[in-house]
Amino acid sequence: RVNVSNYRTTEESMKWALKVCEYRENDCFVIDTSRNGNGPHGNDWCNPPGRSLGLPPTCNTGNDKCDAFLWVKIPGESDGKGNGGPRAGRFWGKMGSELVNNSN
C-alpha cells in the first residue's frame, strides 16, 4: 500500500512504488487516492487545508504493477488535533466537506 493516510499525488506515489518494485520481483501495489487530489500542502501533514479527493477507486490504473487506486483512508477522518481537528481517527465533517467541495 502506497500513500496511505498521506497527500502525495498519484503520479508521485506511482514513481516511488515503481522504484521500490525494481528491488522486489513480482511485487504489486495499490495507491491510496482518498485525499490526494491537490497533493500535499507544504510540510503540513495534520489536516492540511485546501485538500481534495483524488481519483475514485478503480482497478484501471494504466500500470500492470499497480493493482488499484483505493480510498484506504476514510475521507474526512482526522489526522489529529492539528488545524482544529478532533483527535486522530475521528470523523471530522469540516474536512470531509472540504475534500468533496474542492474536488474536480
Outline where the language-model segments fall:
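A recurrent domain-boundary module in secreted/ectodomain proteins
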Residues: 90-104
